[in-house]
């Protein structure tokens, strides 16, 4: 059965009101479209956790900087609908235009402070304000019991967890493991920008993280050699580093080392050609160095 396609705020309110009357549990998967297997894994997990899954497809203009790729961000709505059907989504919210979410005179924005300050937040001013605003609007509009996000955008996930808690939005925020291509490249809609050569060089991000993981398993816990392992792979592949940082997994504050049992995260951002890519992995904590 084809999913309901919701175009306006009124459409969403009418549709969710029907769910509430019938007592259904709702899972929401917010996306910017051009869906890949990572997104579909969120939809399938949503089916396991709720009765009904809604997917939002909205290229959110407020999270793009003036020199970023808003106009060329990849789009394929018909393909996205087919993928949503295959994964079991029952509704798609695809605003008819940006004015649905940001009508004329719009002036309210949400800003999460601490966890948005470093990493991507320091290099993309205003990005997380845009993310926090649109996700707050979606959670308020849909009022889902569950909302699912990928761990590939790890800082974004922590921003969303913070706003959900601080604003008492009541959703269960679920972070799902990064889905990777067979050669280790983290799936991303922006991978479509990469030439074959750039894509091959982009494998340095996951190779570097695996090298750091191996060092940790051998007993190296200091930040400097773990970060250096990633940087060596980036340099060898000719990638331009944006950042490589070891941080506390919850607060995202820099760490000098990984203490036994302490959840930490190693995050990397780099350019392959003109395309900025990000990746990360867990170090320490219950999973004992995580998985790449």
Swiss-Prot record:
EC number: 6.3.2.1
Name of this protein: Pantothenate synthetase
Assembly and interaction partners: Homodimer.
UniProt keyword terms in alphabetical order: ATP-binding, Cytoplasm, Ligase, Nucleotide-binding, Pantothenate biosynthesis
Pathway info: Cofactor biosynthesis; (R)-pantothenate biosynthesis; (R)-pantothenate from (R)-pantoate and beta-alanine: step 1/1
SUPFAM superfamilies to which the protein is assigned, alphabetical: Nucleotidylyl transferase
Active site: 39
Residues engaged in binding (R)-pantoate: 63, 156
Binding-site residues, ATP: 32-39, 150-153, 179, 187-190
Biological role stated in the UniProt entry: Catalyzes the condensation of pantoate with beta-alanine in an ATP-dependent reaction via a pantoyl-adenylate intermediate.
InterPro entries cross-referenced by the UniProt entry: Pantoate_ligase, Pantoate_ligase_C, Rossmann-like_a/b/a_fold
BP-aspect Gene Ontology terms: pantothenate biosynthetic process
Domain of life according to the entry: Bacteria
GO cellular component terms given for this protein: cytosol
A GO term, aspect molecular function: ATP binding
Binding site for beta-alanine: 63
Other facts: The reaction proceeds by a bi uni uni bi ping pong mechanism.
Keyword Transport among record annotations: no
Subcellular compartments: Cytoplasm
Family: Belongs to the pantothenate synthetase family.
């Amino acid at each position: 059965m084809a999913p309901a396609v919701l175009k306006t705020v009124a459409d969403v309110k009418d549709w969710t009101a029907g769910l509430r009357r019938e007592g259904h549990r709702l899972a929401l998967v917010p996306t910017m479209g051009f869906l890949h297997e990572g997104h579909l894994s969120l939809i399938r997990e949503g089916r396991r956790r709720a009765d009904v899954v809604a997917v939002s497809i909205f290229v959110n203009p407020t999270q793009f900087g003036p020199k970023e790729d808003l106009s060329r961000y990849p789009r394929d709505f018909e393909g996205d609908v087919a993928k949503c059907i295959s994964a079991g989504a029952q509704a798609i919210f695809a605003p008819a235009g940006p004015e649905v979410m940001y009508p004329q005179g719009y002036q309210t924005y949400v800003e999460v402070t601490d966890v948005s300050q470093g990493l991507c937040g320091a290099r993309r001013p205003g990005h997380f304000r845009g993310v926090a605003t649109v996700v707050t609007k979606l959670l308020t509009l849909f009022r889902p019991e569950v909302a699912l996000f990928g761990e590939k955008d790890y800082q974004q996930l922590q921003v969303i967890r913070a706003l959900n808690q601080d604003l008492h939005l009541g959703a269960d925020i679920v972070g799902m493991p990064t889905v990777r291509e067979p050669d280790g490249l983290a799936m991303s809609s922006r991978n479509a920008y990469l030439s074959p050569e750039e894509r091959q060089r982009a494998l340095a991000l996951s190779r570097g993280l695996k090298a750091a993981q191996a060092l940790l398993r051998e007993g190296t816990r200091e930040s400097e050699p773990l970060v250096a392992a990633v940087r060596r792979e980036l340099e060898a592949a000719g990638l331009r580093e944006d950042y490589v940082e070891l941080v506390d997994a919850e607060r995202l504050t820099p760490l000098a080392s990984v203490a036994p049992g302490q959840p930490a995260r190693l995050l990397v951002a780099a350019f392959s050609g003109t395309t900025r890519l990000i990746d990360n992995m867990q170090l320490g904590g219950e999973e004992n160095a995580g998985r790449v």
